[in-house]
């Protein structure tokens, strides 16, 4: 077993030469296992949760390169981020031998059953640095920059293929004995003020958040967020999240777009911008099958359509001609017999 790591969602490449350097004699027989770095459900359902590493079928880009979708450390439920505070890397594992899983194609859904046409989805731009704790406990960390000495800081965010409907979530924290106010300014316009309570004997830090509609202040794809807190108060940013409606296009810079339409529950048609000759579509959250191909039909020279049974699932459209990054090689993993280990107080897997 060889461990590889990623830190963010994305399409990653495994090349024949890299696999050989990892020690595999026959890269065509290499198999990929894992479920990435998303935080696992805190309530495990025996009927739906898989209790072992799942094999991920690889997409063969060419004779010397295989592609796969990797989950990073964070995902979204609506406009709420769900992050994994227990890991800094998302782990996958490679092995050689046996028959690698085949990347199957989902059964085609008749176009006549499609109820909606979907060409946009809600995307999120997150600014967050977990560098500081108000108390030596808990799992939420805060930005390393203190607002006590300089109570105004600016942050730059950039959207991709925005179709409007922007909103901004500001989450802030304070560790001061006096109450704190935080003014949010977006592209030169004040949009709202947060209020945070004071600390006390048993309260080491307070938090507050708010979401503001900011679409009226758009200036292209560039967003400057300026936060000003009560002068002299000890306070720190938790995170900024810019939510917006994004067109389903495959950008040339990264070569893929990941999307879903959770507000739709009936068969629908996705319209995806990209070169029909080189665009492929994966569903990456099918139960017990982490990756399956979805059939597409060319609409014109710049887009394709795909009729899907469940538009609320997660899909990834990617360009097979793009040069994708490789995961980080960590090393070989020795076999372990955890059942033979004694004197344990607690095990977290």
Language-model region placement:
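Ligand-binding face of N-terminal immunoglobulin V-set domains in extracellular IgSF glycoproteins
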Residues: 12
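Structured catalytic cores of large enzymes
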Residues: 1-6, 17, 22-349
């Amino acid at each position: 077993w060889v461990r590889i790591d990623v830190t963010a969602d994305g399409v990653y490449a495994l090349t024949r030469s890299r696999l050989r350097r990892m020690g595999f004699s026959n890269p065509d027989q290499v198999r990929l296992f894992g479920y990435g770095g998303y935080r696992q459900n805190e309530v495990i359902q025996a009927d739906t949760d898989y209790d072992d590493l799942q094999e991920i079928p690889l997409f063969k880009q060419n004779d010397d390169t295989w592609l796969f979708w990797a989950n990073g450390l964070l995902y979204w439920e609506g406009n709420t981020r769900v992050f994994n505070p227990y890991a800094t890397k998302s782990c996958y594992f490679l092995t050689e031998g046996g028959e690698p899983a085949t990347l199957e194609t989902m059964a085609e859904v008749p176009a006549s059953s499609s109820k909606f046409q979907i060409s946009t989805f809600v995307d999120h731009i997150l600014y967050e640095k977990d560098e500081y704790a108000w108390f030596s406990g808990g799992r939420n960390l805060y930005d390393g920059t203190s607002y006590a000495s300089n109570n105004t800081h600016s942050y730059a965010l950039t959207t991709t293929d925005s179709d409007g409907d922007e909103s901004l979530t500001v989450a802030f924290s304070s560790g001061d004995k006096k109450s704190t106010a935080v003014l949010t300014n977006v592209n030169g316009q004040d949009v709202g003020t947060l209020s945070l309570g004071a600390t006390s004997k048993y309260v080491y830090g307070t938090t507050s958040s708010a979401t503001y509609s900011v679409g009226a202040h758009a200036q292209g794809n560039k967003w400057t967020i300026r936060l000003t807190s009560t002068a002299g108060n000890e306070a720190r940013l938790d995170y900024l999240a810019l939510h917006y409606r994004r067109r389903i296009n495959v950008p040339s810079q990264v070569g893929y777009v990941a999307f879903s339409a959770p507000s739709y529950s009936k068969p629908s048609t996705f319209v995806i911008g990209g070169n029909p000759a080189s665009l492929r579509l994966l569903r990456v959250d099918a139960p017990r099958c982490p990756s399956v191909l979805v059939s597409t039909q060319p609409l014109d020279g710049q887009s394709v359509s795909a009729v899907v049974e469940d538009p609320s699932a997660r899909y990834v459209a990617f360009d097979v001609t793009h040069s994708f990054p490789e995961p980080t090689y960590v090393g070989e993993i020795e076999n372990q017999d955890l059942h033979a280990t004694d004197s344990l107080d607690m095990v977290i897997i």
